[in-house]
Amino acid sequence: MNPLLSAARVAIAVVWALGMLLPPSTWADGMPYVVKPIAEMKVKQLPKGPLYWRVENFPTLDQAKAAAGEYRWNPNTVTYDGWPSLTAEAAGKVFLFTLGPQGATTPGGTKVAEIGPVPSITAPEYLLRVNYGSGPPGSKTPDHSHFGSEAFYVLTGKLGQKTPHGISYVEAGHTMNGHMAGMPMEVFNAGTNDLTALIMFMVDATKPFSVPATLP
């Protein structure tokens, strides 16, 4: 089975489950903001040190995959070699997403954004996932939380995020770092045009990807 197709089905199931667990008024207040997984990987161990999401463009998907290399277990050093990387096509462009140190670059790539430091978590296994989010003005997600963090790079429009700390906004071409695990949130289109965004997750792979939450 195509892994991205399988992931997309999981995303649809998650959105459906959230909708079933929340009152109908949650969806009636605005159109749903749709998210679709475009890349993911699971790892048993994360690189050491503060980690940043690095977003880069490449001319072709093959070039991005070749530049990414492999994140492989080395029994001699009892650790992983390389940096965990994901490749995907979105909005007519090829992206390479790397979880690594601040200020690094990938040969052949054009840096688009760097987001971090990513709030750390401890888990038996980690899921790194990139979602493509989209929605018209007024669209929003149900109130939810993750067992990890999510970071945003907005492609078009204006993104809003409501948490117990308040409301934050991100314009196209800009980023927003994630919160600590368990943060209740609502993500919504805060502009007058269609919103599209790349959303990078680092979460506990042994727990549900997303769960309903309550905002004050």
Predicted regions and their residues:
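Jelly-roll (double-stranded beta-helix
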Residues: L4-E150, K158-P216
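A cytosolic small-molecule/anion-sensing beta-strand core signal
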Residues: L155
